Structures are given as C-alpha cells and as structure tokens.
Amino acid sequence: MASVIIYFSHRGENIVNGHPLFLSKGNTQVLAEKIHKLTGAVLYEIKEKEPYSEVYEYVNERARKEYETNALPEIAGIIPSLGNFDTIYLGFPIWYRTYPRIINTFIQKAEIKGKIIKPFCTNDEGSFGTAELELASYLKGANTVKAGLSVNGYKLDECDAALEKWLSK
C-alpha cells in the first residue's frame, strides 16, 4: 500500500520569535513538502471554503471561536479517495493550542477508517499542545495514531534529522 500527505497550512502573518512575519507559504506546507521529498508520498492540501484572514490576530480569534463551538469549517474542493492508502501523514499548524477544526471536517468526510495516522505539526512553541490527545480522541480508536512530529516554524531549516528519525518509525 501507499502513503499520502494531507495537510492544512496557512499563509499570511505569523508570529516568529515574538515578532510578526508575513509568510508567502505556510510552515506546515513547507514541512509537508519536506516529507514528500523524503517519502514520495502523494500530497493533498486541505483548503478552506471561507479563507482565513492573513492577519494573525484575526486568524487567532477565528480559531478560538471555532474551537469553542466545535465548528466544522467547510473544505473547498473535492476530498480525494483514500482507499489506496494505508498511511496518512496528517499535518496542521497549532492554533489555540491544538489543531484547526478544519481537520475534524476532513476526518468526518474522508474515508480514513482503518488507516495509520502519523500527525505532524508546526508551531511557535515547540509542542503539540493538546492536539495529539484530541486527535486520538476524535478518531475514537478507528485508526492507529502513531507518535507525532512537532516542529517550530522558525526552525524548519534545522529539522531534517528529527524528520528522518520520525519517518523511520
């Protein structure tokens, strides 16, 4: 069987080392592309139907509201068939100390039952926050969720050794 890299990423203003910085390509996309280069896995980007603002403050506020209301933001486009894949590398930024709720939308609409899920995230703090626990809970035992990889967005150039180690597990 084969692997697929499914990720949600955000372009726009981000906070890097406490300072605002505009990103033309989201950190999670950069990490997903690194995984693709090392594995050859198919890439699929989750895109939101209603785009997030490029202003960090507004993205953070929307993420908080979506988290608190368990919102399921709509996905733009068609969700691919995943029947030919046994492993899903699932990537996202950490927003409001967890994964964006659009990941739940994807989980509900995609055919992921029985898949191996290998989560990866980018963040400014170096941790998954509560994302790994929440993701495992949301998947409710229907999948095997492996240990994830968390990378500081501003250290993407320094993560190759950790990435290769994670991929080998």
PLM regions: where:
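Short, conserved loop/helix-junction motifs that constitute active-site signature segments
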Residues: 82, 108-114, 139-141
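Active-site-adjacent alpha-helix of alpha/beta-hydrolase-fold enzymes
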Residues: 26, 136-142
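Glycine-rich, charge-decorated loop segments at or immediately adjacent to ligand/cofactor-binding or catalytic sites
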Residues: 125-138
